[in-house]
Amino acid sequence: MENKEEKPKIPQNDFCKIQPTIVATNRYDVYLNSLIDKPHYYFDFMEIMRSADAEDEVYIHLNNNGGYVDTAMQIINAIKDSSAKITTCVDGACHSAASLILLSGDEVKVSGHGTMLCHYYSGCASGKGNDIEKQVDFDKTYYKKFFKKIYKNFLTDDEIKNLIKGTDVWMDSKEILKRLKNIVKPKGL
């Protein structure tokens, strides 16, 4: 006798008809496992996020020592623009610019071996002396606001003040998970 799997019977009656619906969804897994480099390397990834439907899911896996903060900002904007559910995952190292991306997801998952480094931006300026001074003054104000917004409720106010003064904040997966409980934010910041 042949053992065939039977489909579950859906109860029906005159008052309630149950119609099974098949919903097609896509799941995209993106692995950011090396330096976050210049934005043009991420255009396909950002296009996937921006064109994904509300039923789709995008998982951003981070095992990364950081990189260009401007590129991280562009990725964060793509997360904000996405209709899909964005889950960011600490798969290993989540340092520097990667930590900014992590905190922008709709949901965050942390592996038992994950680590995180939060620090203030690094950068450089070039040009005529007065132009350099203007850029440095602008960067001070701009990045101070940006980092306060990203790390709000994840880091304490004192940690953010010290971070802006140059102190690094390191944490393991247990500490990351504990702090994530404090965050209530709109999608993508």
Indicate where each model-derived feature is located.
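N-terminal organellar transit peptides
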Residues: 1-189
